[in-house]
Structures are given as C-alpha cells and as structure tokens.
Regions:
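Short, small-residue-biased leader/transition segments that mark boundaries at the very start
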Residues: 1-3
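A glycine- and small-aliphatic-rich helix-loop capping segment at beta-alpha/alpha-beta transitions
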Residues: 8-18, 41-45, 68-72, 181-183, ...
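Active-site nucleophile and cofactor-binding loops and adjacent substrate-binding regions
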Residues: 23-33, 72, 191-199, 226-227
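Active-site-proximal alpha-helical scaffold in enzymes
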Residues: 24-50, 80-82, 200-216
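Flexible, glycine-rich active-site loops centered on histidine and acidic residues
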Residues: 41, 47-77
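Condensing-enzyme catalytic core mediating Claisen C-C bond formation in acyl metabolism
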Residues: 66-137, 141, 145, 227, ...
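Phosphate/pyrophosphate-binding loops at sites that engage ATP/ADP/AMP, CoA/4′-phosphopantetheine
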Residues: 145-162, 210-215
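Catalytic phosphate/nucleotide-handling subdomain of diverse soluble enzymes
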Residues: 205-225, 233-240
C-alpha cells in the first residue's frame, strides 16, 4: 500500500539504531502478533534474530460518545524477540485462518475512497464499529477449532499447555474457550480489566506481565491465540 507515512517498523528500526535489520509493517489487527511471529519464524531459516512488535493507538479510532465501544479499548505496545537455536524449543505448531467475507462485522473506520474511479465520494467514518453478537459467535466457534488444530500439529495435549495467552478482547470469550477445552480458568490469565482491549499488543503485554511476575518461565509450553479484525484467527503452541 502506497503511503506518505513511514512504516511504524521503519520508525522503530531507526529509533533503536538497528541499522543492519530490515523492517516492515504487517496488518492483521488483533491477530497481528501471532501472524507476525509466524512470518518471523519462517525467516529464521535465513536470518539469526528478529523482533515482532504489536502496537496500537486505538484511542484515535474510538467514538467517545459511543458507550458500546469507548469503554473497551486501550493503547499499548509489546515486542517479542526470537532467534535461531538448535535447542528443542520454539514454535511447535500453528493454525492461521482468515475470514474476509465476515470482515464487515469488525471495522476500524474508513479514511479514504474505497473506489476512486467510481466518481462517487465515500462518506468517511473514522470510528471503530463492531457487531458484538457476530464477533462473539465467531470467536467462540472459530478460535477453539484453530487452537485444536495447532495442538494437533504440535502433538501437544490441551492438559500439557501451561498457559493459554488469548487476545484480551472479552472475558466471556476467554472463559468460554477455557470451558470448551476443559481447562481451569487459572491457565487463561486476563488483564483486560486494567488495560482494555489493546488489539495486536494484548498478547505481548500479557506475556511481559506474566514473565515479570515469574509466572511464565523457560521450560513451559505456552499457547498464543489471536482473533479479531479481518476477520482473523491465529493459534500457536510455543515451547519456551
């Protein structure tokens, strides 16, 4: 996509002085960190190390007069560094899915003419909109299927996962998925009560908080599960 703006990745690369690294943006909304880790992991066959960052400023997209969305979202950023290793750790299995035909159920506003050759001027709406019922039904139906597929590919039983780090969208969705897999809710940590829904940043922020608290540590098996705009779903099983 052509833009007059520098990519966020290029800005970060310059700011941290990573002059030998190439940088690019990837857009997958609330599944962004999971999709980004998938791409970065595939690049480790040719490169040594990479950083995947999920960052969102959702306050710019929220209509503060719309009480159905204004109270739900937050701004945030988090990064994950991965590197090539000969140890038996890393990404063990994943499942990524996109449902573009359902994308209208979760949109973050329109900032330009979708078809400049039509001669019509589109009405611009910069605010976030969602069909809450459809998004909930989508998440509780598609997320378990993607997670189950990732577990099978990783040859890991649900009971053997130490923690499930889900996108922090809705406590009811997280609780529903925990129940679906017969797992205690303690294995599904949540922080949306303090941070809100930070979209692509949410899994990374949660991971950092749990590592700082000493709850997540090397030797564990962790699931990352993103879902949201697109609509998209991504589930990964990591051995750390």
């Amino acid at each position: 996509m052509c833009s007059s703006d520098l990519s966020t990745a290029a800005i970060v690369q310059g700011a941290i002085g990573a002059n030998q690294a190439f940088a690019f943006d990837l857009s997958a909304a609330c599944s962004g960190l999971v999709y980004g880790l998938s791409v970065a992991t595939s690049l480790l066959t040719r490169y040594r190390r990479g950083i995947v960052i999920g960052a969102e400023v959702l306050s710019k997209l929220v209509d503060w007069h719309d009480r159905t969305t204004a109270v739900l979202f937050g701004d945030g950023a988090a990064g994950v560094m991965i590197e090539r290793t000969s140890d038996a750790i890393g990404l063990a299995g994943e499942e990524l899915r996109t449902f573009g035909d359902k994308g209208e159920n979760l949109v973050a506003g329109q900032f330009g003419n979708s078809n400049p050759f039509s001669g019509e001027i589109s009405s611009l709406d910069p605010y976030f909109h969602q069909n809450g019922r459809e998004v909930y039904n989508f998440a509780t139906r598609e997320v378990p299927e993607a997670l189950e597929s990732a577990l099978k590919k990783a040859k890991v039983a649900a009971d053997d996962v130490d923690f499930y780090l889900l996108h922090q969208a809705n406590a009811r969705i997280v609780s529903s998925i925990a129940k679906r897999f017969g797992q205690p809710i303690d294995k599904f940590p949540m922080n949306m009560g303090t941070n809100g829904n930070t979209s692509a940043a949410s899994i990374g922020i949660l991971l950092d908080e749990l590592r700082e608290a000493g709850i997540i540590h090397p030797g564990q098996t962790i699931a990352f599960v993103g879902f949201g705009g697109g609509l998209t779903v991504g589930a990964q099983i990591w051995k750390i």
